[in-house]
Amino acid sequence: PNHKSKMVYIAFSSVDIPRGAFMFWKIINRMDASKIFINDEHNGWYVHGIPGVGDVNKSIDFLFNILNMLKAEEVILIGPSMGGYGAMLYGAILKMKMPWIQFRCLSFGGEFHLYIKEARSGKLSKKPRNPYYADIRCLVSSSELDIVQVYGDDDINDIYQAHLVHGIKNIDLISVRNSPHAVSTYLGKKIDLTKAIKNYESYGKFEVESASNVSQFKEHGALLYFGHLMMLDNNAKEAIKKLEKAITIIPDHALTQHKLGLALLMLKKEKEALLHQELAINLNPDLAHAHFHIAMLSEMNGDIKKAEYHYKECIRSDERHIRALISLSLLYEKVKEYELALDCSYKVLAYSEGNKMALDIVRRITK
């Protein structure tokens, strides 16, 4: 506790953080405030309460008593992904129970509706689902908790989650251009995140120079999301209709261009697919999957040099991209660059022990 300050930070950690460790530890400890760090090491999304404290109601009482003891006047709740959801859930409830305190929330990619298709809460939670707290849209809206939701515009679920709350007055949406889901990590490599959070504390604004216009358009998020789901259901024709409409709304969105390219490829429209993948790369040079599909299509067309370049660019963007490493290894084997082929296959085996395709390449070359 910092008894000289009436400001309190409550930081909720994201997934896969071991017991005793906390996210934002260094940044929040630089703040002139009292600090509370919370972690759910079993990826429970905080819907069963704070581990070691009890269910959500008991956890709220626990935080209520601490804030009273600290004589808090201002509270900032902060968290990425699972932690962003926790910050919004507990912030909304605490604000209604403690109206004399100013509560604010800074969420980095938190979900507003858990367990829907493509939601990380459905894929990564290691605890039973709790439908009672699955959809917090009405809760955060009625609580009037001031929320800033910062999210990457290179993530379909994050874009759709923002779509779900677009227009709610107390939620300020900020999309970050070409950022993946781990938007706080992405921003931490590009800006002074401590300074940005301190400015938010002082002025109530979280300013990002790399903000995109994706957060401004509600319909785009639904079109992209449902176009993606239709592709998963092998309904490429309907997916293309939605994705083409999404592109008319935001033509310069790399992820939408990439997804349209994939849908076109499903219908074997290779030339059109390649065009949209190249548009995606022009908009986001680090979009690994777009590089992979350009490489794959180029190899199909016999352009080995272009294929090699884009496989390597894919791996530069995502060094653990197994499909790109395997494809590049096969390409090198085809052109008799055996040492390079082995190098790629050994990298695959380092990331994916026992990978059959990599083992087969190694056996063929070293027999």
Residue ranges and their predicted role:
Residues 118-188, 192-195, 200-204:
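The feature captures the conserved acid-bearing segment of alpha/beta-hydrolase catalytic domains
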